[in-house]
Regions:
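Beta-strand/loop substructures that line and gate deep hydrophobic ligand-binding cavities in soluble
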Residues: 3, 108-136
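Glycine-rich portal/gate segments that line the openings of hydrophobic small-molecule binding cavities
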Residues: 4-10, 36-38, 42, 53-56, ...
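Hydrophobic membrane-insertion alpha-helices, especially the h-region
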Residues: 5-22
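Aromatic-capped interface at the extracytoplasmic side
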Residues: 18-34
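A generic structural signal for beta-strand entry/edge sites
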Residues: 28, 79, 104-106, 130-134
């Protein structure tokens, strides 16, 4: 019986230490995607800066055919936002915000999906290259 108590206490202690250590683990993940577009930056940047344009061609929203999209003023640039929701599944929704916009240079998005407390931070940079644009 003593051995059983000892093993139980050790197990509870180890599980507690593991749970406590997981509080300090960074859950963020970062990755970089680079794409070269065959148009100048003054043609490419407005497609990312205006959320109505962005929602029409973005792969993220193209596979959400039956979703209800709502856009809020201003419709482009810093402060613009949109929300999306699946009318058939009320728990499938989210919001997209443009938090920073530097003309023809940088955009910073925040994407909230569902009930997740922390948003996705999406930084997009535009680099002009002759008559093309490199998007990172």
């Amino acid at each position: 019986m003593r051995l059983f108590k000892f093993i139980t206490y050790i197990t509870v202690f180890l599980v507690s230490v593991y749970a406590l250590s997981m509080l300090f683990v960074d859950e963020s993940k970062q990755f970089t995607i680079e794409k070269e577009i065959n148009y100048p930056v003054d043609k490419v940047f407005p497609q990312f800066n205006n959320l109505q344009n962005f929602a029409q061609w973005s792969a993220f929203f193209q596979n959400k055919d039956n979703y209800s999209l709502s856009f809020y003023t201003p419709y482009e640039g810093q402060g613009s936002s949109m929300s999306f929701q699946n009318p058939k599944n009320k728990s499938d929704f989210g919001d997209l915000f443009i938090r920073y916009s530097n003309l023809n240079s940088t955009l910073k998005y925040q994407l909230f999906e569902g009930d997740k407390k922390s948003p996705y931070q999406i930084d997009v940079k535009f680099f002009p290259q002759n008559n093309k644009t490199k998007v990172v």
